[in-house]
């Protein structure tokens, strides 16, 4: 077992917070699972995708590497990752389905015709990157470095889509809140490790990892504000029509 996953060898101070750590990890897993399910439901409700295929293919590639190729030995982590992978396949299918029929895809003939190839090569490309990082750094370090990058990409692209479209179809407060909760607990669990087991996890407490965490919080915070504002504008427009 790779050092860092073997909690039996951890110092007494870490063992004291181990139940909290597993709780945070479980809450993060549940939050993202709810996000994926809510994303599917919202896309079918509005007949419009609300997330970026770039971010989704990146997430799926990460899940393939760390749920199948380098699965963590912790049973709870293994179950969570494979649950994400299973549901994320349907998220990508649903998103691609409605992206193909959207006006954006219709105005881009190449994307409209070869969307399935863009998705496939996107997954393969990101998979190779996550795998390469796991070889370079070690699976456990790549798990978190790549994971933090995935959080920032997902939050940044979600904000970009919302601002670019100027409407909230395909999106919901539930998608945003579950994404934020899932991500914030994942970040908290990482820094909890570095605080109480610095001999093994000290590498994760550095300026770049803090930047990733800060970027995610800022981007998702801005998303919440922009979503609230856009919803208000939409409600005013409906009131005028009525």
Swiss-Prot record:
InterPro entries in the record: PaxB-like
EC numbers: 4.2.3.-
Localization in the cell: Membrane
Practical applications: Chevalone E derivatives produced by this cluster are interesting candidates for cancer therapy since they synergistically enhance the cytotoxicity of doxorubicin (DOX) in both MDA-MB-231 and MCF-7 breast cancer cell lines.
Entry's Gene Ontology molecular function annotations: lyase activity
Entry membrane topology: Multi-pass membrane protein
Pfam families noted in UniProt: Pyr4-TMTC (PF25129)
Cellular component terms per the entry's GO annotation: membrane
Membrane-spanning residues: 20-40, 50-69, 79-101, 117-137, 143-163, 172-192, 207-227
Pathway(s) it belongs to: Secondary metabolite biosynthesis; terpenoid biosynthesis
Keywords: Lyase, Membrane, Transmembrane, Transmembrane helix
Family under the similarity heading: Belongs to the paxB family.
Functional summary from the UniProt entry: Non-reducing polyketide synthase; part of the cluster A that mediates the biosynthesis of chevalone E and its oxidized derivatives that possess a unique five-membered lactone ring and can synergistically enhance the cytotoxicity of doxorubicin (DOX) in breast cancer cells. Within the pathway, cle7 takes part to the biosynthesis of the molecular scaffold by catalyzing the cyclization of the prenyl group initiated by protonation and ring-opening of the epoxide to produce the chevalone E intermediate.
Matches recorded under PANTHER family: INTEGRAL MEMBRANE PROTEIN (AFU_ORTHOLOGUE AFUA_5G14600), PTHR42038
This protein's name: Terpene cyclase cle7
Organism the protein comes from: Aspergillus versicolor
């Amino acid at each position: 077992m790779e050092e860092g996953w073997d909690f039996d060898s951890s110092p007494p101070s870490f063992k004291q917070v181990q139940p909290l750590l597993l709780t945070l990890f479980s809450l993060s897993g549940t939050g993202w699972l709810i996000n994926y399910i809510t994303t599917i439901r919202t896309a079918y409700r509005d007949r419009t995708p609300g997330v970026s295929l770039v971010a989704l293919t990146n997430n799926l590639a990460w899940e393939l590497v760390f749920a199948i190729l380098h699965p963590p030995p912790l049973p709870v982590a293994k179950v969570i990752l494979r649950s994400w992978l299973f549901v994320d396949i349907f998220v990508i299918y649903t998103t691609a389905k409605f992206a193909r029929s959207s006006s954006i895809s219709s105005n881009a003939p190449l994307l409209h015709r070869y969307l399935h190839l863009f998705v496939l090569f996107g997954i393969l490309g990101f998979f190779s990157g996550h795998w390469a990082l796991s070889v370079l750094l070690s699976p456990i370090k790549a798990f978190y470095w790549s994971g933090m990058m995935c959080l920032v990409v997902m939050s940044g692209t979600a904000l970009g889509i919302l601002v670019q479209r100027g409407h909230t179809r395909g999106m919901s407060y539930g998608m945003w809140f579950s994404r934020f909760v899932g991500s914030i607990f994942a970040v908290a669990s990482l820094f909890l490790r570095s605080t109480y087991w610095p001999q093994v996890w000290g590498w994760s407490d550095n300026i770049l990892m803090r930047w990733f965490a800060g970027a995610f919080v800022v981007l998702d915070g801005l998303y919440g504000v922009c979503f609230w504002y856009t919803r208000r504008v939409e409600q005013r427009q409906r009131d005028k029509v009525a």
